[in-house]
Design a protein with these regions (language model features):
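A short secondary-structure junction signal
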Residues: 43-48, 69, 80-83, 92-100, ...
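Non-heme Fe(II)/2-oxoglutarate
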Residues: 161-171
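Surface-exposed beta-loop interaction hotspot
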Residues: 29-89
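Conserved metal-binding segment of the jelly-roll/cupin
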Residues: 7-27, 37, 142-163
């Protein structure tokens, strides 16, 4: 339903449960993100159209981002949440830094996160910070177009560079 992620902020998706097959035939160039998690329950396939996607503004300036929730607790997918974030040029996302390595609902849940980045124009970049309270991890990465970052644990936050639209698919 869109030629680039920057064209329409409501992606359509398809949930395919375990032990099933799916064939995709495209009429033109297509880029697909395959997102998965472990699940033992049997669930049904589900088409998730634009009207299922929830758009939310998260944070406040200068750390605000527009986020779309594509696959969430209202889908047949269990143990999987997928969304997209659009970060305003020069803004922070996920600030103040947060983490997902302690079971303390509703403030925090245990979850690994992966971000897939795209920029417009493509030579753009973001800075991804990752650290732990004890200092065992304390890193900042320059993330470029078409790159992934994984957060198995620890605090993380992202800053978008001025002059570039920053997008990341998150799960």
């Amino acid at each position: 339903n869109r030629s680039t992620v920057f064209e329409n902020r409501k992606a359509e998706s398809f949930y395919m449960p375990r032990e099933q097959r799916l064939t995709i035939t495209a009429r033109d160039h297509i880029k697909i993100a395959v997102c998965a998690s472990l699940i033992e329950e049997k669930t049904e396939p589900q088409v998730l159209r634009e009207d299922h996607v929830v758009l939310k503004l998260l944070g406040e300036q200068p750390y605000q981002r527009e986020t779309s929730f594509i696959i969430d607790q209202n889908s047949n997918a269990k143990h999987l949440t997928v969304g997209e974030a659009y970060v305003t040029e020069g803004n922070w996302a996920g600030f103040p830094p947060h983490k997902h390595d302690t079971d303390n609902m509703p403030k925090e849940c245990i979850a690994e996160e992966i971000y897939y980045f795209l920029f417009d124009p493509k030579q753009g970049f973001a800075v991804q910070c990752l650290y732990t309270a004890d200092g065992s991890i304390d890193e900042a990465y320059r993330v470029k177009n078409d790159e992934l970052v994984e957060f198995p644990y620890g605090y993380h936050t992202t800053v978008a560079t001025p002059g570039y639209q920053t997008y990341f698919l998150w799960l």
